[in-house]
């Protein structure tokens, strides 16, 4: 059971997890864990499933998925009958009015839909995941000199579950450098998995780029892959002018994570998100929603 904070009704909700029985079996049974290490965490498994989700045969999954998880298709640019395959549906674009952008330059917005955690006064040797598992920022970024620039800064971890909108966006005007890709495995990023596999974010395939924002300084913008995420697709053009809310990219099928790192004294995260993070609870947010303010 995954409990998260709903800031709209100021109460806790229970997340309905796609493939929950499979996740629990894989990460809680000896057979499942052995299968995970031998096969499921490997690129080959995610590629196979990604291949299926790119084929017309997978279209039959769409309506069941929509009904099971009560996905509001009135927000989508296209309806279910217009999608060619499951990945076409999974990476669907939303109507512009579905995700209004807070235009005030001092407001920090969420880069996507999902559940968010926030950490201030970043300790480079110990960043805390869901369930209290720690990992090293040095190991995550694999660049010690760059990592040191973010000592005592702020970290935001946005977890996108399979039922979420899976495109991610820029949080400010600015210019973004080329993407750096780091090889890794494909463990699940669901809290069920995070509690069983130490330092998942450091072990999984991930990509990051430096975003030179106009109002929040230089930000490390990282995307982390997960089980069945066949691809992390970057749609932005490096080293060109970017506007707040512009699309940066998207994930193909699977749960995935966006992580942002800010330098010291650049932002102040909203108190409700910070307080819930300290209690160990994620907060649900949508792309374009205000989550903090410029210092």
From Swiss-Prot:
<keyword id="KW-0210">Decarboxylase</keyword>
<dbReference type="InterPro" id="IPR003817">
    <property type="entry name" value="PS_Dcarbxylase"/>
</dbReference>
<feature type="modified residue" description="Pyruvic acid (Ser); by autocatalysis">
    <location>
        <position position="256"/>
    </location>
</feature>
<comment type="subunit">
    <text>Heterodimer of a large membrane-associated beta subunit and a small pyruvoyl-containing alpha subunit.</text>
</comment>
<keyword id="KW-0670">Pyruvate</keyword>
<protein>
    <recommendedName>
        <fullName>Phosphatidylserine decarboxylase proenzyme</fullName>
        <ecNumber>4.1.1.65</ecNumber>
    </recommendedName>
</protein>
<dbReference type="InterPro" id="IPR033179">
    <property type="entry name" value="PSD_type2_pro"/>
</dbReference>
<dbReference type="InterPro" id="IPR033177">
    <property type="entry name" value="PSD-B"/>
</dbReference>
<feature type="site" description="Cleavage (non-hydrolytic); by autocatalysis">
    <location>
        <begin position="255"/>
        <end position="256"/>
    </location>
</feature>
<comment type="pathway">
    <text>Phospholipid metabolism; phosphatidylethanolamine biosynthesis; phosphatidylethanolamine from CDP-diacylglycerol: step 2/2.</text>
</comment>
<comment type="function">
    <text>Catalyzes the formation of phosphatidylethanolamine (PtdEtn) from phosphatidylserine (PtdSer).</text>
</comment>
<keyword id="KW-0594">Phospholipid biosynthesis</keyword>
<comment type="similarity">
    <text>Belongs to the phosphatidylserine decarboxylase family. PSD-B subfamily. Prokaryotic type II sub-subfamily.</text>
</comment>
<feature type="active site" description="Charge relay system; for autoendoproteolytic cleavage activity">
    <location>
        <position position="169"/>
    </location>
</feature>
<keyword id="KW-0456">Lyase</keyword>
<feature type="active site" description="Charge relay system; for autoendoproteolytic cleavage activity">
    <location>
        <position position="256"/>
    </location>
</feature>
<feature type="active site" description="Schiff-base intermediate with substrate; via pyruvic acid; for decarboxylase activity">
    <location>
        <position position="256"/>
    </location>
</feature>
<dbReference type="Pfam" id="PF02666">
    <property type="entry name" value="PS_Dcarbxylase"/>
</dbReference>
<keyword id="KW-0443">Lipid metabolism</keyword>
<keyword id="KW-0444">Lipid biosynthesis</keyword>
<dbReference type="GO" id="GO:0004609">
    <property type="term" value="F:phosphatidylserine decarboxylase activity"/>
</dbReference>
<keyword id="KW-0472">Membrane</keyword>
<feature type="active site" description="Charge relay system; for autoendoproteolytic cleavage activity">
    <location>
        <position position="113"/>
    </location>
</feature>
<dbReference type="GO" id="GO:0005886">
    <property type="term" value="C:plasma membrane"/>
</dbReference>
<keyword id="KW-0865">Zymogen</keyword>
<keyword id="KW-1003">Cell membrane</keyword>
<keyword id="KW-1208">Phospholipid metabolism</keyword>
<dbReference type="GO" id="GO:0006646">
    <property type="term" value="P:phosphatidylethanolamine biosynthetic process"/>
</dbReference>
């Amino acid at each position: 059971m995954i409990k998260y904070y709903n800031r709209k009704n100021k109460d806790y909700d229970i997340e309905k997890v796609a493939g929950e029985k499979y996740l629990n079996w894989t990460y809680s049974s000896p057979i499942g864990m052995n299968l995970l290490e031998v096969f499921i965490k490997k690129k080959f498994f995610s590629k196979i499933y990604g291949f299926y989700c790119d084929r017309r045969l997978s279209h039959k999954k769409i309506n069941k998925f929509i009904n099971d998880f009560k996905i509001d298709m009135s927000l989508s640019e296209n309806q279910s009958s217009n999608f060619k395959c499951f990945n076409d549906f999974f990476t669907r674009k939303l109507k512009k009015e579905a995700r209004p952008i807070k235009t005030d330059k001092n407001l920090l917005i969420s880069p996507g839909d999902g559940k968010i955690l926030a950490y201030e006064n970043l300790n480079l040797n110990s960043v805390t995941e869901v369930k209290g598992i720690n990992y090293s920022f040095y190991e995550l970024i694999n660049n010690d000199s760059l990592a040191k620039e973010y000592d005592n800064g702020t970290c935001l971890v946005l977890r996108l579950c399979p039922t979420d909108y899976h495109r991610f966006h820029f949080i400010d005007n600015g210019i973004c450098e080329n993407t750096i890709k780091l090889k890794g495995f494909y463990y699940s990023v669901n809290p069920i998995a995070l509690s069983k596999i130490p330092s998942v974010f450091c072990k999984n395939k991930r990509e990051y780029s430096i975003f030179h924002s106009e109002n929040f300084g230089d930000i490390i913008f990282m995307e982390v892959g997960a089980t069945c995420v066949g691809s992390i697709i970057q749609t932005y053009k490096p080293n060109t002018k970017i506007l707040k809310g512009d699309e940066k990219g998207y994930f193909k099928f699977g749960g995935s994570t966006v992580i942002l790192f800010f330098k010291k004294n650049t932002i102040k995260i909203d108190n409700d998100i910070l307080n819930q993070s300290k209690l160990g609870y994620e907060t649900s947010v949508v792309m374009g929603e205000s989550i903090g303010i410029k210092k």
